[in-house]
Amino acid sequence: MDKKLHIIGLAGTNGAGKDAVGLILAEKHGYLFISVTDLLRHEAQRRNLPVERENLRMISAEWRRELGLGVLVDKAVAELEKDREKYTGVVMASMRNPGEADRIHDFGGTMVWIDADPRVRYDRVQANAAARNRAEEDNKTFEQFLAEEEAEMHVPEGGDSAMLDGAAVKARCDVFLTNDSADLATLEAAIQAALKL
């Protein structure tokens, strides 16, 4: 009998803790964790492009135009299928296009929106930049951080459906978490309660 596919998409604001939630689900609940941002970073490196948010946005939009709005979800599910019996399911961080949220729902999955106070998020990003090999990518002022986030929340005028639209993703989410605490145990308890794990 085929094992039922469990799929969770994580979306939210920058520095809210999407990767932390993904890692908790992987380590404590047996999910395969895939960071969509890491997939895009690898592609930027393969193309010899600077790993900057603008290039990652460009690559993701290009893939969506060429391969469909749910392409990043399909890539993650393909990774899970390589060794499906080993995992509970797949959890993907950084869903930033409504087509990705729709694709997660097509699979019967759950979309989770994670947020935190903007200053808390900015401080997290700055504190973790070097440890995550993103010092150059994340070296921004608070104002630049907020401006980049705003650019990713709405399709710009004249943009198309392949572009980032965080607000439309948020509108498609099933579960909402606030992660203002630095305590991972608090976050883990919130995840377990919200997802009924």
Model-derived regions: residue spans:
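ATP-binding Walker
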Residues: 16
